[in-house]
């Protein structure tokens, strides 16, 4: 018996749903008149269902249990039905959720996954009903809001599951409004009642905390409006014509709506095209005087974005829903995290099995738990994986940041969406756009700035100029040179002179060469000429002489002076006969015969400078003597001849 257990476990594991066969394979669902059409993210049809119905209209989606709820206006017994998309089933069985009670006409559907309640508007009875899907289908629904006495006409409905609010549109053309109320029926508030005509479908964007609704304007025009959840900061997302939109759906970055006229689904970016009106109501925020304050702001148009036709349908398009990844995206949201935990806890409780488990059942449970990868939670009753932030896929096997950023680093945002931080020189949602891509023309080289704020610049090749090297100087100059041939007085840019000369060599009949006055002045002079070199050398020499003079003067200024010695000698002009015994004391010469010699400091003393006679002996012995020896002998002879 034990031999069959592993085999049975292996067979059961092989029969588990594969990753490509789970309900996560579709991203959009659209109700046509006689069927529901499922489409993927590229708007390719995957499958169709609910072919047994004849007049489908509104629909809503329970993403927690993968259930679609829709309305059929002509069914005899039921009014609202549920359908589960099963990729392995040959057909999709729709079950009755709400029994028909009369001649009702459902305008809009909404679902609350926390309390498991359905909300819908009845355009004939002018009421908003709700009912629990856990109650028997035969149990009559309850009235949440009765608008019959006011003459209002409720159309679209939407549930804010995080803040526990219900929003609806009133398309009564005499007094159209957008209103909200708590899901328990209290605190009704009008959030918009001006500058609207006939609001239709409405949806709450939990990611941006904003409302979006369709307004069927007068004539052939329509608009998609947006505001905060309290009605403030109203904006016109788009305005166009020749559409008859009914319902809309949202993704992270786009709006989708169904058009009955063109039988198609259209899309537009979610950002606003014009900021319209900001309204703050007293119920939300009171002013100082306690009255309603309304401020009009000037329209601020942004870049126009055309509408995109994403899907052509075979029948009249009506309701539409989109998969938003609610449980993954809002796990960290301040308003939604507690609601997500409560819903997940309820799903876990529903998945618990109370019967006695065998060995095979326990092993099957282990296989089911291992079915979801990367920490995903497996909901066995619905065969569904709830993935943690950063992972997606039917088994949470795909990391959202894997290969997401082309030239950058990927991180998960607070809303569990991948976000790219680009490298310098790259931009785009996935850093896929280079700032230099296609910037420089004609072979120019792109240079990035030193900082992220600096714009890239182009280094242009010869004969090209401009911020993007888009100006071809050869072509421009050729036009001037051709025109100069016929109009000689025209001014030709200076840079065209050489180009015109080159063009004239090949086509001298049509090309004229401009003649500029004082052309040599405009040319770049040669700096190192002979005159410049001479002036430079002379300047250096004079500079050196000046420095030498200054240094010598400083030395003479600070050098001490030598003492000046002055001595006077008296001698005869002519020697006497027999004068060997004469001395200056015994025989002093007379005044007429004497001669005085003054010697200063012994430095200006020389035989040639002596005004008296020159002894013969000195002439003979000092003929070839040096200056110093000459001075010594002169002093010696003078001492001998003193009187």
From Swiss-Prot:
Region (Disordered): 276-303
Secretion signal span: 1-21
Segments passing through the bilayer: 531-551
GO molecular function annotations of the record: calcium ion binding; Wnt receptor activity; Wnt-protein binding
KW Cell membrane (keyword) present: yes
Cytoplasmic-side segments: 552-643
LDL-receptor class B repeats (start-end): 116-163, 164-208, 209-254
Name listed for the protein in its UniProt record: Protein cueball
């Amino acid at each position: 018996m034990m031999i069959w257990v592993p085999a049975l476990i292996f067979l059961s594991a092989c029969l588990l749903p594969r990753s490509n066969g789970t309900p996560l394979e579709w991203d959009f669902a659209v109700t046509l008149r006689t069927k529901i059409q499922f489409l993927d993210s590229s708007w390719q049809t995957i499958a169709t269902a609910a072919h047994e119905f004849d007049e489908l209209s509104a629909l809503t989606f329970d993403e927690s249990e993968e259930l679609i709820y829709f309305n059929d206006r002509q069914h005899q017994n039921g009014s609202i039905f549920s359908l589960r998309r099963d990729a392995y089933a040959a057909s999709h069985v729709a079950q009755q959720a709400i029994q028909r009670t009369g001649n009702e006409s459902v305008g809009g559907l909404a679902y609350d996954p926390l309390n498991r309640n359905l909300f819908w508007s009845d355009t004939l009875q002018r009421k908003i009903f709700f009912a629990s899907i856990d109650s028997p289908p035969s149990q009559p629904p309850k009235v949440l809001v009765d608008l019959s006495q006011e003459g209002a006409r409720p159309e679209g409905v939407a549930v804010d599951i995080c803040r526990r609010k219900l929003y609806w549109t009133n398309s009564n053309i005499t007094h159209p409004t957008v209103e909200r109320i708590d899901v328990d029926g209290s605190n009704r508030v009008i959030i918009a009642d001006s500058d609207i005509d006939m609001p239709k479908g409405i949806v709450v964007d939990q990611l941006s905390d904003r409302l979006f609704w369709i307004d069927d304007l007068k004539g052939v025009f329509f608009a998609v409006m947006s505001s905060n959840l309290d009605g403030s900061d109203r904006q016109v997302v788009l305005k166009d014509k020749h559409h008859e939109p009914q319902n809309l759906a949202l993704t992270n970055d786009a709006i989708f709506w169904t058009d009955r006229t063109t039988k198609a689904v259209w899309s537009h970016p979610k950002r606003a095209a014009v900021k319209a009106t900001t309204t703050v109501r007293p119920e939300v925020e009171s002013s100082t005087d306690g009255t309603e304050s309304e401020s009009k702001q000037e329209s601020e148009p942004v870049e126009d974005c055309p509408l995109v036709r994403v899907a052509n349908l075979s029948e009249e398009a009506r309701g539409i829903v989109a998969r938003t990844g609610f449980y993954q995206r809002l796990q960290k949201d301040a308003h939604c995290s507690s609601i997500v935990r409560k819903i997940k806890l309820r799903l876990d409780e529903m998945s618990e099995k109370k019967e006695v488990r065998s060995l095979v059942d326990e092993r099957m449970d282990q296989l089911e738990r291992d079915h979801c990868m990367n920490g995903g939670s497996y909901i066995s009753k619905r065969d569904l994986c709830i993935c943690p932030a950063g992972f997606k896929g039917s088994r949470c096997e795909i990391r959202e940041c894997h290969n997401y950023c082309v030239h950058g680093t990927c991180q998960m945002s607070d809303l569990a969406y991948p976000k790219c931080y680009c490298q310098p020189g790259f931009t785009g949602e996935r850093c896929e756009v280079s700032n230099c891509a296609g910037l420089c023309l004609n072979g120019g080289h792109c240079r990035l700035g030193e900082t992220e704020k600096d714009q890239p610049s182009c280094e242009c090749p010869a004969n090209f100029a401009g911020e993007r090297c888009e100006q071809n100087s050869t072509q421009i100059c050729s036009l001037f040179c051709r025109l100069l041939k016929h109009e000689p007085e025209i001014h030709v840019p200076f840079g065209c002179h050489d180009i015109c000369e080159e063009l004239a060599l090949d086509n001298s009949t049509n090309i004229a060469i401009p003649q500029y006055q004082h052309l040599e002045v405009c040319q770049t002079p040669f700096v190192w000429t002979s005159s410049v070199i001479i002036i430079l050398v002379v300047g250096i020499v004079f500079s050196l002489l000046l420095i030498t003079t200054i240094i010598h003067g400083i030395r003479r200024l600070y050098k001490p002076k030598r003492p000046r010695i002055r001595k006077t000698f008296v001698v005869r002009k002519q020697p006497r006969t027999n004068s060997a015994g004469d001395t200056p004391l015994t025989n002093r010469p007379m005044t007429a015969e004497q001669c005085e010699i003054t010697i200063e400091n012994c430095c200006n003393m020389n035989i040639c400078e002596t005004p008296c006679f020159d002894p013969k002996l000195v002439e003979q012995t000092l003929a070839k003597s040096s200056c110093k020896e000459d001075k010594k002998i002169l002093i010696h002879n003078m001492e001998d001849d003193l009187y």
